[in-house]
Amino acid sequence: MVRAKNWTLKKHFHGHPTDSDFELKTVELPPLNNGEVLLEALFLSVDPYMRLGSKRLKEGDTMMGQQVARVVESKNPAWPVGTLVLAHSGWASHSISDGQQLEKLLTEWPDTLPLSLALGTVGMPGITAYFGLLEICGAKSGDTVLVNAAAGAVGAVVGQIAKIKGCRVVGAAGSEEKVDYLKKIGFDFAFNYKTVKSLEETLKKAAPDGYDCYFDNVGGEFSNTVIRQMKKFGRVAICGAISMYNSTGQLPPGPSPESVLYQEIRMEGFIFNRWKGEVGQKALKELLTWVLEGKIQYREFVIEGFENMPAAFMRMLKGENVGKARSESLKSGTCKPGDHPHDLIFPIT
């Protein structure tokens, strides 16, 4: 019998999640049936969507999420022992799968690259950035692109893809450390939205002629201000609204209908799983190539230990992460934190 540890939703969040909202449970997994595999988590992801998605869970359910896992026992010939996979097993140290929802890592994945990037730059956040910018926004050479939460897992990739495509890129972030990071990875203009005297004036200074594309991860009043500075026929990709996820009061009104109407702005929300299958795999391969060529740089916000999953989640929602936030489940994993110069380690104290 394998004893699995699961982080469960003890009670639904009210405002900012707290430790008391989670419960760590240990369960004994049954023997495998034919066609099933036993997975051992190596790296687990925490993402903003989990804050909203948790509303669909029942209290007592395992928290949702993606992980890089290793097959440690198999009764499915398609998934032999030792296979490394992407699994939607949630916050679980071990899980059983019938193989239907598993994905293999790209065959081109080099030994020199951390496997955890399959949860970040060369994974769901990368796909979100890739298609949100290139398909939803339709960014092209010469465009001025604005992205907020720009030092996060999605935003940092958005900005770097935009630079690859010949755009001028403006990024907003919530600390001076993050602003410095954005400048380091090639943003043309970056600012700390928490310290500027006037968001409106800062946006005008960054792009006096306005913005062609706006990749929105934040929502709220920030976005209302941006909409008023969009160019004619501007495009807005609505990826998230993290500024409002923990709100318990009345939400701010949306953007001015007058601005949207007379500037003929196109706004579209989207979710990454629209691009599954071959089209998604092609994008992942291109992202991997850009990483290996040094055209896309990355950082990871790493918290060690499965027991610290709630802490990783809460710190990500508070904006403490630079780059992709994830947890290292097992110290016996194939890539230890610190093995790669782009890792940022934030131990729990």
Curated annotation (Swiss-Prot):
This protein's record includes keyword Acetylation: yes
UniProt protein name: Prostaglandin reductase 1
Cellular component GO terms, alphabetical: cytoplasm
Family: Belongs to the NADP-dependent oxidoreductase L4BD family.
UniProt-listed InterPro entries: ADH-like_C, ADH_N_2, GroES-like_sf, MDR_fam, NAD(P)-bd_dom_sf, PKS_ER, PTGR1
Catalytic activity: 13,14-dihydro-15-oxo-prostaglandin E1 + NADP(+) = 15-oxoprostaglandin E1 + NADPH + H(+); 13,14-dihydro-15-oxo-prostaglandin E2 + NADP(+) = 15-oxoprostaglandin E2 + NADPH + H(+); 13,14-dihydro-15-oxo-prostaglandin F1alpha + NADP(+) = 15-oxoprostaglandin F1alpha + NADPH + H(+); 13,14-dihydro-15-oxo-PGF2alpha + NADP(+) = 15-oxoprostaglandin F2alpha + NADPH + H(+)
Modified sites of kind Phosphothreonine: T18
Keyword terms: Acetylation, Cytoplasm, Fatty acid metabolism, Hydroxylation, Lipid metabolism, NADP, Oxidoreductase, Phosphoprotein, Prostaglandin metabolism
